[in-house]
Amino acid sequence: MSESAPAGSKEGVSFGNLPRPEPRTSKDQQKLSISTDVKKPSHSAPVTPVRSARSSMEQPTFRPVAKNSVTVAPARAAGFCPPQFEEYHHGRSHSLVSPPPSPHFLKRISFDTFNNKAATDFSLTLKTQHQAYKWTRTSRTFLCGMDGNSYSEVAVDWLFETLLADNDEAVVLRVIDPSSKLAEDLSDEQSYRSLAEHIMAGILKKVDDDKAVSIIVELVVGKPQDMILRTIHVYSPDSLIVGTRGKALNSFQSLLSSGSVSKFCLQKSPIPVIVVRPDRKRVRSKNKRLKDKTRKSYMEILEKSGR
């Protein structure tokens, strides 16, 4: 026995209380296809194809920029503006050239009294200083007398090698006796100046480049004894250094000989005096004392001092 399909069903499908749909016709399908078409609104902008947009990115338009600037064309075309940098041009005006090295000793002062016709004595002063020289409360001033003899050169050498230290000042006094032959040869001011510059150049060769000292050359025409006392009064040095011939005489007889400048300095100088003998004669005297058996105490002192 077979069951019959309920009312309101089609081919075994039940629609319940819903109204039964009507079958679609060819006219209804035509209306549905027309309604599904997308119509472009009148207010929308035209759509650019993707390929044409890429071609416009590859061919950007350029804007004139400054000559000395750095730009990136692809970044500008993409809407990014990089910061502007001025280009550095290396030329003579921008090149860093080190200045020539300055000399270790610089000229500071130079004057003379040759133009003063009323003066009885004439003098010429040359002064030079190391570029690192600086006067301090512990700075010392030394006066060294010299002449044309070799023993005076020994005194100058000993001063700069042994006694002179940084920030000290050395005054080298060169006295020319008016009655000497040298005074006759030096007839004009230029000849005196040339002699003073020659003395200064010889002294600078004796000084180490790293020794910060001040050097003064006093070239004076007059009596040596009077000029020494006058120079001591002007500069107030701490001590006076002079040379000696070192004759083979006992004790201070050679220093106190008649007419000796060292004798005058020892007797009349208001400041301490250092008398320097030539090196070879000092070594000879030292060896002689070492061989003397009666001076054992002196030899012991030398051994303890390491000399």
Curated annotation (Swiss-Prot):
Tell me where it resides: Barrier septum; Cell tip
- Whether Phosphoprotein counts among this entry's keywords is yes
An MF annotation (GO) of this entry? catalytic activity
Q: Can you supply one Gene Ontology CC term for this chain's record?
A: cell division site
Q: Which residues carry this modification: Phosphoserine?
A: S44, S98, S102
Alphabetical keyword list: Phosphoprotein, Stress response
- Coiled-coil-forming residues are none
Q: What is its main location?
A: other
Concerning InterPro entries, the annotation shows: Rossmann-like_a/b/a_fold (IPR014729), UspA (IPR006016)
Q: Which residue ranges run through the membrane?
A: none
Q: Where is the composition biased (Basic and acidic residues)?
A: 21-30
UniProt modified residues of type Phosphothreonine: T48
- Map out region (Disordered) in residue numbers: 1-63
Instruction: Write out the similarity annotation.
Output: Belongs to the universal stress protein A family.
Official protein name in the record: Universal stress protein A family protein C25B2.10
- UniProt source species: Schizosaccharomyces pombe (strain 972 / ATCC 24843)
